[in-house]
From Swiss-Prot:
Protein name, UniProt field: [Skp1-protein]-hydroxyproline N-acetylglucosaminyltransferase
Pathway: Protein modification; protein glycosylation
Similarity comment: family membership: Belongs to the glycosyltransferase 60 family.
Gene name, Swiss-Prot/TrEMBL: gnt1
InterPro entries linked to this entry: Glycosyltransferase, Nucleotide-diphossugar_trans
Length: 423
């Protein structure tokens, strides 16, 4: 495999733009042979209501080696975190770089080389000599500029920096936004947060900080929980010097997984939210490697089910069979194994190494915070107090409060651009 190979992770829920996203990203790559796409297609497999999603046969066009597919009936979809976990577990085959995007994107020409070059420009201090070295744990991430259907791409390429915008009233999870940078950047600038719709890094991130398949039906909370997990595992966030990818912010043309909203689904979503509350109300200095021993059987069972499911997908893709539903029952059954300690999830109860709570929810080590840095470290770094739900000026301006007047585009110009294409 080429040393510059890129694995592109895409999840699509009944999205007619996915096919054109795949076509665009391959056509505009400089080295098309280095691009390998793993896509989870969630659509109606029982009728032709989603035929619009398959006007372009990308699997036939590019081959099954370059396009790896999980097919799932849309009624079995369990939200973005679950789908992204399936793609990581079943379709990744050791490519060097990892690009995670949404199913409605457009790219600049030679985007593959641009992203690799910018990733290699990310530098961090060298503790040995006081100089700077390439950051091997760098992640390029931001909310991309928007595009309009069918292919209206803006001519400007302004960088976008992630900022904290507030806490959700219903769930209490941090919301993120994007501010347009007017300052000319020579190299990628440090960022405080991570987002799921554009993330480019070395592929070791898949094994180091994998998606948690137990966060079923979760939407808000995905990005800030991954931000905290990645940061505490030693990863650093950067915004590219210019726009490399575009996102369709208008959702009117497509369905979302929220169309399936039974009482059972609502309960599973609430359990996912509780998992994140546990994550943000623990002291990760008390997370130890022994937790993994308690979870080996659960994780092995989960992996075996995923492997079996992947084999089924490979054998049945052409028949459009639903090959992913068995994984969800495996994940749910594993979540029920707990030691019933009924520990409090508050920050003060720091003896809870297994991270159980009154609901029997347990966060396995590989889906937990890291040990390289603490959650308090991340709170100080990003300017967000997760316990008291406050944001200081550092968080509101993405770490560039002191130079905000010269770093960011003025609010009127930013409003005009956002109203035209969105961010």
């Amino acid at each position: 495999m080429n040393e510059n190979s890129i694995f592109v992770s895409i999840i699509s829920y009944r999205d007619s733009e996915c096919q054109w996203t795949i076509k665009n990203l391959i056509e505009l790559a400089k080295y098309k042979e280095n691009i390998f796409i793993g896509v989870c297609l969630q659509y109606s497999m029982n009728d032709d209501s989603d035929n619009k999603c398959f006007q372009f046969n990308f699997e036939e066009e590019y081959g099954k080696n370059q396009i790896r597919i999980i097919r799932m009936n849309h009624t079995e979809a369990k939200g973005p975190c679950y789908a992204r976990a399936l793609v990581q577990q079943q379709l990744f085959k050791g490519e060097k770089y990892y690009l995670q995007i949404d199913s409605h994107m457009r790219f600049v020409k030679d985007w593959d080389i641009e992203m690799i070059n910018q990733l290699l420009q990310c530098k961090k201090p060298n503790d040995d000599n006081g100089g700077m070295v390439i950051d091997e744990k760098a992640i390029l991430t931001c909310y991309p500029m928007g595009y309009k259907l069918p292919n209206l791409i803006p001519t400007h390429r302004f960088p976008i920096l992630l900022v904290a915008s507030g806490f959700g009233e219903n769930d209490g999870f941090l919301r993120l936004g994007g501010k347009i940078v007017s300052k000319k950047l020579i190299e990628p600038c440090s960022s405080l947060f991570w987002v799921s719709g554009f993330s480019f890094s070395r592929s070791d991130i898949i094994n180091s900080v994998p998606y948690d398949p137990n966060l079923q039906y979760l939407f808000f909370g995905e990005e800030i929980s991954m931000s905290a997990r990645l940061f505490t595992h030693g990863y650093n966030f950067y915004s590219p010097t210019k726009t490399l990818i575009f996102h369709l912010w208008n959702r009117d043309y497509r369905s979302t997984f929220r169309e399936n909203n039974s009482l059972e689904i609502q309960k599973l979503e609430e359990n996912s939210k509780k998992r994140l509350l546990i994550l943000f109300n623990q002291n990760n200095n008390n997370i130890n490697d022994n937790d993994d021993n308690n979870n080996n059987n659960n994780n092995n069972n989960n992996n075996n089910n995923n492997n079996n499911n992947n084999n089924n997908n490979n054998n049945n893709n052409n028949n459009n069979n639903n090959n992913s539903s068995s994984s969800s029952s495996s994940s749910n059954n594993n979540n029920n194994n707990n030691n019933n300690n009924n520990n409090s999830s508050s920050t003060n109860n720091n003896n809870n190494n297994n991270n159980n709570n009154d609901d029997g929810i347990k966060i396995e080590l590989k889906y937990n915070l890291g040990k390289i840095k603490s959650l308090d470290d991340y709170s100080n770094y990003c300017g967000v107090d997760f316990k008291n739900k406050t944001i200081n000026n550092k968080g509101k301006f993405g770490g560039y409060y002191e130079e905000r007047e010269t770093f960011f585009m003025n609010e009127i110009m930013e409003y005009v651009i956002k109203s035209q294409i969105g961010i």
